[in-house]
Swiss-Prot record:
Catalytic activity, EC: 3.5.4.16
CC per GO annotation: cytoplasm
Catalytic activity: GTP + H2O = 7,8-dihydroneopterin 3'-triphosphate + formate + H(+)
A GO term, aspect molecular function: zinc ion binding
Keywords assigned by UniProt, alphabetized: GTP-binding, Hydrolase, Metal-binding, Nucleotide-binding, One-carbon metabolism, Zinc
Official protein name in the record: GTP cyclohydrolase 1
Superkingdom in the source lineage: Bacteria
Length: 234
């Protein structure tokens, strides 16, 4: 197993310092620190550009874009790429849609084994796996499906797994201001399987711990034990 760990917060850091540090971390999904601006009116224009690019790629590998089997390939690839990167067209505010509730709950909430698929930004090849996401509420909870949707939103972009893990943790921190957030992601990368080192069966594991999960060993251990526990209702 290949293991990588991404811990952005130092031990003992309080919540105020935590928020300041999170906001200062670099994010290559922004342009000069500004959010990516999406222009829905350009969808068809961008699709045509991608189709032209696919035709060039086909010609560059010695194929004929006009042969029967490839006639619709540029359109299919462009539409697939628009689907696989639709996370750029989503915002955290619209995704959550006010589904935050005052419950007074202060014990761990964990959604585990969330399937995700993303594209490596280096080779634009898929990586996929499972995400485990937990938080300890500070009187507020969010609809469980929203946690899975947050994973989906950030996965549907060009990514590296380390940044993806951190972005998910930061998003939950932003919407709930909980006592702590923990994210572990396990994935296999096609750029390591299909090309390059060509190592099928290798997995990359990344983690991001915020607040009590970073500062309290028992809390962190409880989370790690829970994601290893096999449910008995299957």
């Amino acid at each position: 197993m290949t293991i990588a760990s991404s811990h952005s917060i130092n031990n003992g850091m309080n919540t105020g310092k935590l928020v300041n540090q999170l906001s200062s971390l670099p994010d290559r999904n922004t342009h000069n620190g500004q959010e990516v601006k999406y222009h829905p009116e350009n969808v068809e224009l961008n699709k045509e550009k991608m189709m032209d690019a696919v035709r060039v790629m086909l010609e560059s590998v010695g194929e004929d874009p006009e042969r029967e089997g490839l006639l619709k390939t540029p359109k299919r690839v462009a539409e697939a790429m628009q689907f696989l990167t639709q996370g750029y067209d989503q915002s955290l505010e619209k995704l959550v849609n006010g589904a935050i509730f005052d419950e007074g709950h202060n014990e761990m909430v964990l959604v585990r084994d969330i399937d995700f698929f993303s594209l490596c930004e280096h080779h634009m090849l898929p990586f996929m796996g499972k995400a485990h996401l937990a938080y300890i509420p500070n009187q507020k909870v969010v609809g469980l499906s929203k946690l899975a949707r947050i994973v989906e939103m950030f996965s549907r972009r060009l990514q590296v797994q380390e940044r993806l893990t951190r972005q998910i943790a930061e998003a939950v921190q932003e919407i709930l201001d909980p006592q702590g957030v923990a994210v572990v992601m396990e994935a296999t990368h096609m750029c390591m399987v299909m090309r390059g080192v060509q190592k099928p069966g290798s997995w990359t594991v990344t983690s991001a711990m915020i607040g009590s999960f970073q500062n309290e060993q028992k809390t962190r251990e409880e989370f790690l034990n829970l994601i290893r526990h096999q449910p008995n209702f299957y």
